[in-house]
Amino acid sequence: MDDQPRLMHSHPGVGMAGHPSLSQHMQDGTGANEGDVGRKQDIGDILQQIMTITDQSLDEAQARKHALNCHRMKPALFNVLCEIKEKTVLSIRGAQEEEPSDPQLMRLDNMLLAEGVAGPEKGGGSAAAAAAAAASGGAGADNSTEHSDYRAKLSQIRQIYHTELEKYEQACNEFTTHVMNLLREQSRTRPISPKEIERMVSIIHRKFSSIQMQLKQSTCEAVMILRSRFLDARRKRRNFNKQATEILNEYFYSHLSNPYPSEEAKEELAKKCAITVSQVSNWFGNKRIRYKKNIGKFQEEANIYAAKTAVNATNVSVHGSQANSPSTPSSAGGYPSPCYQSDRRIQ
C-alpha cells in the first residue's frame, strides 16, 4: 500500500490529470489560441496604422514610403497586386468606351461663336448691330448710339466669359496634374497602366465639363437678353424718329376718311421718312387698329393735325394768290401816281 503512492508519483502520466494524450491536447489548444490572438493583434495594429496615415506629417509619410520601397518583400507584394489586377482588368475594359460629344455643349459653342463671344474677337456684335440697323431701315444718331451701347455691353459679356473660362481651365489643369502625379507616385507600389491614367483624366474632364456648360449657358442667356433689349426688330420698327412720325401722322389724319395710302404714296412716304415701304405699311396698319380702338383718345390728335393741315393750306393759298396778282401801284415804285390838274384831266 505504501508503494502505490510512490508508483503514481513516479509515473505522472497515470490518472486523469496526468494522461499524456490529454496533456498534449491541452498544450496544443493553448498554442492555437495564442496564435489566433497574435494574428488578431497584428491585424488590429495594421488597421490602426492605416487609420493614422491621415494624421502623419509629410516627413513621416515619406519615411514610411521609403521604408516600403526598400523592404525586401516589396517585389513580392507588387507581383501579387499584378496578379489580382490581371483578374479584374477584364471587367473594366468593357466600360472604357469613348462617350460622344454632348450635343447641348456643341450648340452652346456654335451660338457663342456666331455672336462673337467665343473665338477671336472679329466684330460679331457689330455684324449683329448692322443687321438690326438694316431691319429697322435707318441709321440715324439714335440707332448709332444704341448700337454702340450694344457693342460695349457685348464686349463686357465677352470679357467676363473669357475671364471665367480661363479660371475654369486653370483649375481643371491644376487638378488633373495633381491627380496624374499622384497616380504616377502610387504606380511604384501598385500597378497602374498609362491607359488607366488617361481614363482617369477623361473622367476628371467630364466632371469639370458640367461647370463649363453652366458658364456657357449663362453667357448665352446674357447675350439673348442683350439682343432682345437692343436688337429686337419689332421694337426698332416702332421707334421712328420724331420727323418720320410727324410725316406719317399728318398723312394719316389728312386722309382719315380713307387712310389706305397707295403704293406710290407709300414709296413717297418711305423716302421722306428714310424707312422701308413695308415699314410704312406696318405703321399704317397698326395706326388704323389703334385709332379704331380709341377714337376718343385720338380725336384731339386728329384735331391738331387737321388745324396744322388747314394752316399749311392757307399759307399755300396766300402765297399762290400773291404770286398770280399784279403789283399794287404806289408812289414809291411801280406805276406812276396819277396827277389831277385844274382842267380835271389825268396826266
From Swiss-Prot:
The keyword Transcription applies. GO terms for cellular component: midbody; nucleus; transcription regulator complex. SMART domains: HOX. SUPFAM superfamilies: Homeodomain-like (SSF46689). Residues 233-295 bind DNA. GO terms for biological process: animal organ morphogenesis; brain development; cranial skeletal system development; embryonic organ development; eye development; neural crest cell fate specification; neuron development; positive regulation of DNA-templated transcription. The displayed sequence corresponds to the ortholog of the mammalian isoform B sequences. There is currently no X.laevis ortholog sequence for isoform A. It is found in: Nucleus. Pfam families: Homeobox_KN, PBC. Belongs to the TALE/PBX homeobox family. InterPro entries: HD (IPR001356), Homeobox_CS (IPR017970), Homeodomain-like_sf (IPR009057), KN_HD (IPR008422), PBX_PBC_dom (IPR005542), TALE_homeobox (IPR050224). The keyword Transport does not apply. Residues 38-232 form the PBC domain. Residues 45-124 are annotated as: PBC-A. Residues 1-37, 318-347 are annotated as: Disordered. This is Pre-B-cell leukemia transcription factor 1. One of its GO terms (molecular function) is DNA-binding transcription factor activity, RNA polymerase II-specific. Forms a heterodimer with isoform 2 of meis1; the interaction is necessary for neural fate induction. Shows broad, weak expression from blastula through gastrula stages. At stage 14/15, expressed in a broad arc that gives rise to the forebrain and eyes. More intensely expressed in the lateral neural folds (presumptive neural crest) and as horizontal stripes in the posterior neural plate that give rise to the hindbrain. As development proceeds, expression progresses posteriorly along the neural folds and at stage 21, expression is pronounced in the prospective hindbrain and in migratory neural crest cells. Residues 318-331 have a biased composition (Polar residues). Keywords: Activator, Developmental protein, Differentiation, DNA-binding, Homeobox, Neurogenesis, Nucleus, Transcription, Transcription regulation. Signal peptide: none annotated.
